[in-house]
Structures are given as structure tokens and as C-alpha cells.
From Swiss-Prot:
Its main location: mitochondrion. The gene is MT-CYB. One of its GO terms (biological process) is mitochondrial electron transport, ubiquinol to cytochrome c. Keywords: Electron transport, Heme, Iron, Membrane, Metal-binding, Mitochondrion, Mitochondrion inner membrane, Respiratory chain, Transmembrane, Transmembrane helix, Transport, Ubiquinone. InterPro entries: Cyt_b/b6_C, Cyt_b/b6_C_sf, Cyt_b/b6_N, Cytb/b6-like_sf, Cytochrome_b, Cytochrome_b_C_euk/bac, Cytochrome_b_N_euk/bac, Di-haem_cyt_TM. Component of the ubiquinol-cytochrome c reductase complex (complex III or cytochrome b-c1 complex) that is part of the mitochondrial respiratory chain. The b-c1 complex mediates electron transfer from ubiquinol to cytochrome c. Contributes to the generation of a proton gradient across the mitochondrial membrane that is then used for ATP synthesis. The chain crosses the membrane at residues 33-53, 77-98, 113-133, 178-198, 226-246, 288-308, 320-340, 347-367. This is Cytochrome b. Its cofactor is heme b. It comes from Rhizomys sinensis. One of its GO terms (molecular function) is ubiquinol-cytochrome-c reductase activity.
Length: 379
């Protein structure tokens, strides 16, 4: 009798994806973040579901309902803070996952990479919508400022903004639809994740050398399941420590003040994981130009396979490109810091220089470095 996991139609899919999957024997800890992202997604859906049971998407009661969850619901405070800080863990894993894909040349798997970019946009949209729901000062003004950017789109902009708002300002209709979208998007993300995995398993995983590893593969279970469990334990330790000891470390104190349309906070800023894109948006004086730069800061990832000029896939054996990659990482950290600073003299200039450097490295310097490395290899 054949093994059930190899014969049953449903078990067969799970078996091919997580048990008997042929995996390169040399993939490092950087390949852990895909599974960690899956765990983060499941965790966010479960905690979000429990929060949705008690949340009220009405402008008069939204803030109070969040306070009620924290005060009166059994372990409501824990569920709420795991959900809020879980989003931060999600983005940390996401940025590391994208960084690994860029460093080791995983963008040459075109379908997997492009679905990944769709996932980034969907996750960012979900996080933005979720930030609006507690209906604090930063929620309200963040929603107003970010949705207002769409008015920069020529001809249809102002109508589009009013259509999204469901009126002439951010109000009850806006909050209701944002809640509905925030609830449905994680399930769309789950569907995209399945597509992402499907295309990945068509080609097989990349590895640190960037070479074909068909001659040297091992089953996913038990080797990489054990490795993933270790990553999961470390991530959960960090998340639980953050949630229990310093739950508001990554939040904004302004969001503990109920939304007031008549009082603008001195410094409107999004959550930390959007600050790099926000800094790029602010560094361009023109509204439409800023919006285009904001979208391009993520959309530029689509061009990476076209800008790949080296015969070597990975950066493992390319020291010049490695230097540029780490300058890019430092540049993104600088942009994140600038996004959280007020719009004042030194910060404006630093933001503009960092924004120009970000696009220059990806569009000009990395392809040139690849060409130069080709030349040096021929000597």
C-alpha cells in the first residue's frame, strides 16, 4: 500500500510543497524568511479575526472600541499588541526576504519575483488601512494626507479622492470601507502567496552560489523544517518580548489621542516601515512628482531582472556589486531616519541626496558594476 501522503490528492500537494520538496543542500539562514512571512500572515489573520469581533467601524465608537478591547476583553490587550507589533515583524521579515532576493539574484525567477512585488504592494496597502482603524490623531491625519496624494493624478485625481473618501473628507464612510478592505486583503494576499509558492516550486529554490543545484538536493523535511522551527522560535521570542515589555515602542503617542479634524498634529508621519518611501515622497517639491517617486520606489524592483548585466547570478563572488548593495542598505536606513524627522533645513537636503542615491544605485551603478566585473573577469 502506498503512503497516504503520496497518494491522497490533497496530501500530495502538501507533500510536494513541504515534505518531499527537493531543496538545495547549501541554502543559508537567509532562506528562512519566506516561511517566517507565512507564519506572520497566519498570525495576523488569526489575531485580526479576534479583533474584528470586538471592533466597531464607526467614527464615534472606533477609538472607544479599541480601548474596550484593551480593557474589557479577555487578553484583548495581548491580541491587539501582537497584531500591531506582528505587522512590524512582518515588515522586518519582508525587507530581509527582498534583500536576500536582490543579493542572491533570485529576481531571475521572473514569475515568482513579479508576484512578490504584487505581494509587497498588497501588504503595504493592508498595513496602511489597518493603521487608520484605531481612529486616533495619526490614523485620521495619515489617512487624509496619503489619500489626498491621489488628487495629484491629472484630470481624475480630485474625483478619485472623493470617491475613495465616500464624501468630501475622511469620515464614517471612509472608515467603514477601510475596515472592509483591511479585512479582505489578507485573504487576497494568501491567494497571491499560493501563486508565489507555485511558481517557486516550478523552478526550485535558488542558493547562495547562484549556480544550478539539481545535482545536490535534499528533502525539505526534516532538514529545513527543523531549521525553520528555529527561526520561528527566535522570531516569536523577539515578538513576545516586544509585546510584553515595550508594546508602544514602534507606535506613535499621537494615536492615543482621539481623531480631531480641527487639530493637526505638529508632525504627520506613517509607521516606521513606510518612512523610507515617505522620505522619497517628501524629497520632491512637486506633488505629482512625489507620488510617482513613491510608487517607483517599490515598482523599480520589477526592472531588476532587466538591469542584471553580470553572467554571475549572485553577488557572492562580485565584491564591487556587494559594496553597492550595502551602500543601498545604508541609504535605505538613512531614508527611514529622514522620514521620521521634521521638514527642516539639514533633513530636506539629506533626504534629497539619499533619494537620488537610491535610484542611482539601482538604475545606474549596479548595472555598470556588473559590466565592469565582466571586463575584469576576462583579464
Amino acid at each position: 500500500m502506498t503512503n497516504l501522503r503520496k497518494s491522497h490528492p490533497l496530501m500530495k500537494i502538501i507533500n510536494h510543497a513541504f515534505i518531499d520538496l527537493p531543496t538545495p543542500s547549501n541554502i543559508s539562514v537567509w532562506w528562512n524568511f519566506g516561511s517566517l512571512l507565512g507564519i506572520c500572515l497566519i498570525m495576523q489573520i488569526i489575531t485580526g479575526l479576534f479583533l474584528a469581533m470586538h471592533y466597531s467601524s464607526d467614527t464615534y465608537t472606533a477609538f472607544s472600541s479599541v480601548a474596550h478591547i484593551c480593557r474589557d476583553v479577555n487578553y484583548g490587550w495581548l491580541i491587539r499588541y501582537i497584531h500591531a507589533n506582528g505587522a512590524s515583524m512582518f515588515f522586518i521579515c519582508l525587507f530581509l526576504h527582498i534583500g536576500r532576493g536582490m543579493y542572491y539574484g533570485s529576481y531571475t525567477f521572473l514569475e515568482t519575483w513579479n508576484i512578490g512585488i504584487l505581494l509587497v504592494f498588497s501588504i503595504m496597502a493592508t498595513a496602511f488601512l489597518g493603521y487608520v482603524l484605531p481612529w486616533g490623531q495619526m490614523s485620521f491625519w495619515g489617512a487624509t494626507v496619503i489619500t489626498n496624494l491621489l488628487s495629484a493624478i491629472p484630470y481624475i485625481g480630485p474625483t478619485l479622492v472623493e470617491w475613495i473618501w465616500g464624501g468630501f473628507s475622511v469620515d464614517k464612510a471612509t472608515l467603514s470601507r477601510f475596515f472592509a478592505f483591511h479585512f479582505i486583503l489578507p485573504f487576497i494576499i494568501t491567494a497571491l502567496v499560493m501563486g508565489h509558492l507555485l511558481f517557486l516550486h516550478e523552478t526550485g529554490s535558488n542558493n547562495p552560489t547562484g549556480l544550478n543545484s539539481n545535482a545536490d538536493k535534499i528533502p525539505f523535511h526534516p532538514y529545513y523544517t527543523i531549521k525553520d522551527i528555529l527561526g520561528f522560535i527566535i522570531m516569536m521570542l523577539i515578538l513576545i518580548s516586544l509585546t510584553l515589555f515595550s508594546p508602544d515602542l514602534l507606535g506613535d503617542p499621537d494615536n492615543y489621542t482621539p481623531a480631531n479634524p480641527l487639530n493637526t498634529p505638529p508632525h504627520i508621519k506613517p509607521e516606521w516601515y513606510f518612512l523610507f518611501a515617505y522620505a522619497i515622497l517628501r524629497s520632491i517639491p512637486n506633488k505629482l512628482g512625489g507620488v510617482i517617486a513613491l510608487v517607483l520606489s517599490i515598482l523599480i524592483l520589477i526592472l531588476l531582472p532587466l538591469l542584471h548585466t553580470s553572467p554571475m547570478r549572485s553577488l557572492t563572488f562580485r565584491p564591487l556589486s556587494q559594496c553597492l548593495f550595502w551602500i543601498l542598505v545604508a541609504d535605505l536606513i538613512t531614508l527611514t531616519w529622514i522620514g521620521g524627522q521634521p521638514v527642516e533645513t539639514p533633513f530636506i537636503l539629506i533626504g534629497q541626496v539619499a533619494s537620488i542615491l537610491y535610484f542611482s544605485i539601482l538604475l545606474i551603478f549596479l548595472p555598470l558594476a556588473g559590466m565592469l566585473e565582466n571586463k575584469t573577469m576576462k583579464f
